[in-house]
Design a protein with these regions (language model features):
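Hydrophobic, well-ordered secondary-structure elements that form the walls
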Residues: 4, 38, 56, 92, ...
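C-terminal beta-signal and adjacent terminal beta-strands/loops
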Residues: 64, 162-171, 179-181, 187-243
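Hydrophobic alpha-helical packing residues
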Residues: 4, 15, 147, 240-243
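Hydrophobic alpha-helix-in-membranes signature
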Residues: 12, 115, 135-138, 180-181, ...
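Gram-negative outer-membrane beta-barrel transporters
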Residues: 50-62, 81-168, 200, 211, ...
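Outer-membrane beta-barrel signature, preferentially recognizing the C-terminal barrel domain
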Residues: 1, 7-63, 70-100, 135-141
Length: 243
């Protein structure tokens, strides 16, 4: 199946953008622009044994007054408008699900994105080297792989993520503080579902950053190493008729 779309974009600054202390900028302009997108998708299946689906799309986005938070000489970040930004790229996704038998099921998912986001406005000064460069903190490449194995009401999920290097400066200077190196991330989750008379109960335990990867999302702010989450979800069956 083929698809195509043209979208008119318009975004107001958030309250944080305008009034966060310190760093909010009440003088921000609204973002506006157009997004052009086209793509292909497919889906095939065999009875109830397996399903295979995938999609690939190309997008081309032209935004005026793009809002971005950048570091200041005062030691904190503040949002500014970039007059013209050209963001474009390719996004690919594939899904595969198979019933191994009546109780066991396996699902696989993969994504890949190539997303350059280029500043195409005018330089604000003679020292401004940001024009024609990738926007700070936006990776050009990213990918994910995940697998889910279920047995009746049990589920085991593994997710792997990759993010390419990100620049921290608008000039894209490659220095010790000018870029953040690429990193890999692995998370694993074990879950169990229960169906009670009055509610559906879900228990999940997750190990984030399974291999204790050292990485940064923002310069000088290390992210947690291996860490653990526990989740309990309760969905009441109020109003449902008993079978």
């Amino acid at each position: 199946m083929a698809k195509a779309s043209i979208t008119r974009n318009y975004r107001f600054p958030t309250l944080n953008d305008l009034y966060f202390l310190p760093g909010g900028n009440p003088a921000l302009n609204n973002e506006s622009g157009f997004t052009y997108e086209t793509g292909l998708s497919f889906s095939v299946d065999k009875d109830k044994v397996y399903t295979l689906s995938g999609s690939a799309s190309w997008f081309d986005q032209h935004i005026n007054d793009w809002i971005i938070w950048l570091p200041t000489s005062k030691g904190f970040y503040s949002p500014v408008n970039l007059k013209k930004v050209h963001a474009y790229g390719v996004e690919v996704q594939a899904d595969y699900a198979v019933a191994i038998d009546k109780a066991w099921k396996l699902g696989l998912n993969g994504t890949f994105a190539w997303t350059p986001s280029i500043h195409e406005g005018e330089p604000t000064s003679k020292a401004d080297q940001s024009v024609g460069k990738q926007l700070p903190y936006i990776p050009e490449y990213s990918a994910t792989l995940s697998g889910r194995l279920t047995y009746r009401s049990w589920g085991l999920l593994y997710k792997w993520c990759y993010y390419s290097e990100r620049y921290t400066m608008t000039s894209n200077a490659v220095s010790y503080t000018g870029h953040l190196p690429p990193y890999l991330m692995s998370n694993v989750t074990l879950e169990k579902g229960f169906s009670l008379r009055w509610a559906d109960l879900s228990l999940k335990g997750t190990v984030n950053n399974l291999f204790d990867e050292e990485y940064l999302s923002v310069l000088s702010r290390p992210m947690p190493g291996i860490n653990f989450e526990f989740f309990i979800g309760i969905t009441p069956k109020w109003g449902k008729k008993k079978k």
